[in-house]
Amino acid sequence: MADSHGDTGATMPEAAAQEASVFSMTDVVLFSLIVGLITYWFLFRKKKEEVPEFTKIQAPTSSSVKESSFVEKMKKTGRNIVVFYGSQTGTAEEFANRLSKDAHRYGMRGMAADPEEYDLADLSSLPEINNALAVFCMATYGEGDPTDNAQDFYDWLQETDVDLSGVKYAVFGLGNKTYEHFNAMGKYVDQRLEQLGAQRIFELGMGDDDANLEEDFITWREQFWPAVCEHFGVEATGEESSIRQYELVLHTDIDVAKVYQGEMGRLKSYENQKPPFDAKNPFLATVTTNRKLNQGTERHLMHLELDISDSKIRYESGDHVAVYPANDSALVNQLGEILGADLDVVMSLNNLDEESNKKHPFPCPTSYRTALTYYLDITNPPRTNVLYELAQYAADPAEQEQLRKMASSSGEGKELYLSWVVEARRHILAILQDYPSLRPPIDHLCELLPRLQARYYSIASSSKVHPNSVHICAVAVEYETKAGRLNKGVATSWLRAKEPAGENGGRALVPMFVRKSQFRLPFKATTPVIMVGPGTGVAPFIGFIQERAWLRQQGKEVGETLLYYGCRRAAEDYLYREELAGFQKDGTLSQLNVAFSREQAQKVYVQHLLRRDKEHLWRLIHEGGAHIYVCGDARNMARDVQNTFYDIVAELGAMEHAQAVDYVKKLMTKGRYSLDVWS
């Protein structure tokens, strides 16, 4: 009460003073408003008088916009063969380019095309072009999935009922027999086009990357073109010849700000990073941790942590992180030296076909050093078409003959290529060293070499626990070839050398992006999970376990969590040993089962432990609705594990083998048996 009395107890002189103060303030405010309004009126009226009369903006002409009709482009440029490619690592694109280049030998003109850049509904108009043919080089990614650039095409094929009568086509698929869904994309495209009324003019080709993909392609190609000639009534105009696709332009006086320094897409994108980040716009992540995981000296297994703060990159447990590596500077320098080239010359390789969407084989202008370091694959054995093109530069007739033989489709040539190049793992530098007379111009070599591709790793962390970092688990690849050379993995050697930020005053940066995966924990946290991941195959399960531990901390009920892990010896390469022991101790891991393959006389693998626990596993699968996850080697481990589950289901489910196989296949269809494997 005293406070309220105090509020009204002012004397008359004080009240008068307050009133005068209020009136003077009101005057000031009113005066300011009037002045402001007058000023605004004069200023903005004047500006409005200067605005030109509005005129309708003309729409850009069809030639200035991105062409979505590949048929119109074919008509405009006189092409009658289009080769579409679904490519994740660049191989399918390379094959498509080779096929489109072949066409000129038969009096035809071809073009390679990315289905992501065109409206594939235009296929129905293809018969408007005389002797038109659509070829599809389709790679299968992961577990029967389309590649990123073919996803829209795949979706369209599933949804459309367009009539493709009169469309002539052929398909070559790229796959790997160690995977469950071998060449699924190639098979689907081939079958679906026929269902829509298109006419297959040559049988489906299926390349196997687990064997010899290059030989599979050559064998299919040498039978494909005679079938095309017979169907369209044309003849080959001559032998395969060397035709340059790009012309060299040297930049002797160019602003360095206009020169690419390793960026994958937009110039200066590494200096001015803008989301969203993807394959064409990777994020430069700082390496904050790079530690060796194992105790042994025979191999180097490592754990890296990449800082993705402020990138707006989101990921989930089970996703993949892709990194763009750089070639070893020593190899690059040796290439420059053996070719007698100045690697710091700035140049551009410009497509001679002005109508092509692909203006350069890699970002240009750039230096030879940058191209060989960041853009070109210099460590994988070159394909036969590269050897064929290089042969013309061999001064020694014997060396030229050998190169042409290896590039041929003869049985002897294929065998020589397989043994001398593929099995001996000879990269381009090794070939130049072994053939002293072979010295191609560096610009032509840069045109011929394939692009250096991103490397994918299963993310070894959970975004619930580590929202601002992505973790990688990898083994440094290093081996001696049959020729006695020491070869090193491009990406793992590069990652191994990345020192965490702050250790030497600088930042170790990794261009990266995240690729979504179907390898996901069950929607219901109470669903049991059975994880099988020997070696670095444990990576995604570290993320899974972290996430389940986080859920438990949030008070959620979590189902049984079983891990079957395998390594050689406990003291040598037991990855994440302390972390896994901690998860077992706190109850997140219901079971931690470790198979040591070299700890005892008789080797023990993860499938042996699965057989040991068959009753419990069957109960979890059949009654508990458990989800099974397998990560690691596709060639042996994944197949053996799958066969083990067939046996468990057959025995404890009282089924015939065929019934057990069908049971497991249905688990896969329902998303209860997931694979994240590689070969």
From Swiss-Prot:
Give the membrane topology, semicolon-separated if more than one.
Answer: Single-pass membrane protein
One of the GO BP terms on file: response to hormone
State which ranges are Lumenal (membrane side).
1-21
Reactions performed catalytically: 2 oxidized [cytochrome P450] + NADPH = 2 reduced [cytochrome P450] + NADP(+) + H(+)
Q: Where on this chain does FAD bind?
A: R425, R455, Y456, Y457, S458, C473, A474, V475, Y479, G489, V490, A491, T492, W678
Tell me the cofactor note: Binds 1 FAD per monomer. Binds 1 FMN per monomer.
Q: What is its EC number?
A: 1.6.2.4
Annotated binding of NADP(+), by residue: R299, T536, S597, R598, K603, V604, Y605, V606, Q607, D640
Keywords for the protein's UniProt record, in alphabetical order: Endoplasmic reticulum, FAD, Flavoprotein, FMN, Membrane, NADP, Oxidoreductase, Phosphoprotein, Transmembrane, Transmembrane helix
Xref: Pfam families:
FAD_binding_1, Flavodoxin_1, NAD_binding_1
* Keyword Phosphoprotein tagged: yes
Q: What GO molecular function terms would the record report?
A: flavin adenine dinucleotide binding; FMN binding; NADP binding; NADPH-hemoprotein reductase activity
Where does it sit, as one GO cellular component term?
A: cytosol
The protein's job, in short, is:
This enzyme is required for electron transfer from NADP to cytochrome P450 in microsomes. It can also provide electron transfer to heme oxygenase and cytochrome B5.
Protein name according to UniProt: NADPH--cytochrome P450 reductase
Q: Which organism is it from?
A: Oryctolagus cuniculus (Rabbit)
Traced from the root, the source organism's taxonomic lineage reads: Eukaryota, Metazoa, Chordata, Craniata, Vertebrata
